Amino acid sequence: MDLFLRLGNVLTEVVTSIFGVTLSEQVLLWNSPKKREYGDFSTAISFLIAKEVRLSLHEVACSIADGLRSFKDLFKNVSVASGGFINVFLTSDTWSEFLAAVSDDAGGYGFSDIGHAVPLNLEFVSANPTGPLHLGHIRGAVLFDIFAELLDKFGFSLTREYYINDAGKQIDLLVYSVFVRFCEQLRKKESDNFPSNCYAGDYIRDIASYLISTFPDSVKDTTELKSFSDTFREVILSLTMDMIKSDLAKLGISYDCYVREKELHEGNYIEKVIAVLDEKGYLDEEELPSPKGKSGDWVERRQKVFLSTKFGDDTNRALQKVDGSWTYFASDVAYHYHKLERGFNHMIVGLGADHAGYVKRLSGVVEALSGGDARIDIKLYNLVNLFRNGKPVKLSKRNGDLITLDDVLESGITVSEIRFAMLTKSSEIVLDFDLDKFVRASYDNPLFYVQYAHARCSSLLRKRGPSAKCDAAMLVEKQELDLMVTLAKLPSLLKVIVVSGEVHKLTFYLHEVAERFHALWNAGMIENKFRFIIEDEPELTNARLILVKAVKNTLASVLKVMKIEPAERM
């Protein structure tokens, strides 16, 4: 039951009937008032309407309040504050209906079909296949996997996609790194001067050993880099992608589709999209300024460019190098043309914050290719700083100090704790991941705090289950009313998250629900009147147990969309 939507529909009906004004985004028209004594909910709609109809704020607020008072089955009290806000208290029947609905909904509270099976492509992680994932990748993987779960729940026809960048210089460097270790192992002696620009993790040694033991007949013919690359490049790529897929599987993440950059090259997609952009008038040749850090030896030459400045970018972007080869950006353009060709007019891409410069250029590409009929939402996420024993652990993908998912799991952290931790801050903010905090069974551990609330609910319901009938009129304590209002926020909050992608708000909401529940539990430890089960007050006990069941279902609904199993006992 979406209580905010119901209130929004009523408010829309009242405003339209009185002023002839049509409202949008009904779920956002109601909020919690600053002080609980003002009401269950509050709206500032009078401020918007007064400007449009050119009447005084007080006059508009009073007219709307009178209209709301006609819905006697919904509102117990409607008042106008001096500032023009309209505050309402709901009837006990409304709250009874709400609690009954949520307590009966064991798996789907908060979700609705707003996607209507619209095709949507969500591309995320897409890390270069040069080794196992680091924590920055893991943060993006978890964020967008949970976002994908939400999009599924809200009825979108979602395709989870991974783009394999397997045609660039990083793969050449990966192959060379393995080749160096391969030659060392054949000589049975490691060099003290391993190239500093190479990938130096232990997994490089493991790949080299695998090649020698698995393909003994090919070893003697691959002691030169070219022959080695021709023979083993695809094998090495397969092995590193298996590492990535293994890490993702441990996190509970899978994909519907993998697209290889190499296949786009082989299918001449770059040439195809260049022709399309040229025909549409979005190509030119011009001399571009030197890249950052290369001004000393930079020689200006004319290059084929995409006119991204037409779409708000600060410079046009090179598609072809002076030697005739295509730029990395040209592959990106071809890839998004490939998405459009597959019928995706709505795309979401998750990128690291270091790719912020891609937002305008990729948005421009999609607009240029689709004529404005398709849209792309590029959502950025920041780095992760890992702490052990209060000391930061540096992350690096190219040296032996690489911190992998297995390293974190071996420290005692569970996958559920990792998934929760990745959402404890906005994705735009650098995340400090404190391993010590998440292994402690205490309120300092944010997942423990939430799971303990769910386990307490389960414990109460094992002792006594509520009857079917709920009388919310029995729930009059401030802590109870605060908790009910918080539960009612979930459906509208989830809709906001589906639009914005701000999935960290899930953990913030879980903490708020748990905090209000623990407050009520702790009050019962001090005063008997706050206890959930009071033997000589069966009606109050039943109402409180229905509230407990609603809390349990709400916590479970959000935890499950995060792929975290709610704890029944702790």
Curated annotation (Swiss-Prot):
Gene Ontology molecular function: arginine-tRNA ligase activity; ATP binding
SMART domains for this protein: Arg_tRNA_synt_N (SM01016), DALR_1 (SM00836)
Chain ranges for the short sequence motif 'HIGH' region as given in the UniProt record: 127-137
Keywords recorded for this protein, A-Z: Aminoacyl-tRNA synthetase, ATP-binding, Cytoplasm, Ligase, Nucleotide-binding, Protein biosynthesis
Catalytic activity: tRNA(Arg) + L-arginine + ATP = L-arginyl-tRNA(Arg) + AMP + diphosphate
HAMAP family reported in the protein's UniProt record: Arg_tRNA_synth
Protein name per UniProt: Arginine--tRNA ligase
Gene source species: Neorickettsia sennetsu (strain ATCC VR-367 / Miyayama)
